[in-house]
Regions:
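Glycine-rich phosphate-binding loop of ATP-dependent small-molecule kinases
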Residues: 1-188
Length: 188
């Protein structure tokens, strides 16, 4: 049974929305580096302040910071029955690190869901979300920079997981419900 997953997709592809549904369906917790970082930023920790500066410029938080958060979370009891990783890994180094941590735990990923979306549609989605949620990291220049960073650093993960025969490619351009129906059919 599928219990350890990663969800990939450009910023604004709907990863968080679909992650919640997948977690409910499979009865597993979500593992979100974005949520962990937002909590650190809200608490005003040193890590949170540094992360906020980088995120507001549209850059990724360095692997060294993320990796220490990820390792302690993956080794916690909360994720021992499975998880859905949302926002991690974002590059090949992080994927190798995650594989290593899971190997230490005598387990591995079961599947990787990739939400494939039209990038211009994503810009529109994110600008709309920025208005609704008042997110400082969703200005148009920052969005375009995040998409560029995604393309350069994160897209190689699609190839990596395809070669590992873990990739489930999903057309993410439909409605929330159409995308969800596609995901459900692939997971069953």
């Amino acid at each position: 049974m599928i219990k350890r997953l990663v969800i990939l997709g450009a910023p604004g592809a709907g990863k968080g929305t679909q992650a919640r549904r997948i977690c409910e369906l499979l009865d597993i917790p979500t593992f979100s580096t974005g949520a962990m970082l937002r909590a650190q930023m809200q608490e005003g920790t040193e890590l949170g302040i540094k992360a906020k500066e980088l995120i507001n410029r549209g850059e990724l938080v360095p692997d060294s910071i993320i990796s220490s958060l990820v390792e302690s979370e993956l080794k916690s009891e909360r994720f021992s029955r499975g998880f859905l990783a949302d926002g991690y890994p974002r590059n090949l180094e992080q994927a190798h690190f995650m594989d290593s941590v899971l190997k230490d735990l005598d387990t591995q990923l079961d599947a990787v869901i990739n939400l494939d979306v039209d990038l211009e549609d994503v810009v529109g989605r994110l600008l709309k979300r920025a208005e609704i949620e008042h997110r400082s990291d969703d200005t148009e220049p920052v969005i375009r920079r995040r998409l560029q960073v995604y393309h350069e650093q994160t897209e190689p993960l699609v190839r990596y997981y395809r070669e590992a025969k873990l990739l489930i490619n999903i057309d993410g351009n439909g409605s929330i419900y159409q995308v969800w129906d596609c995901i459900k059919s692939k997971l069953s």
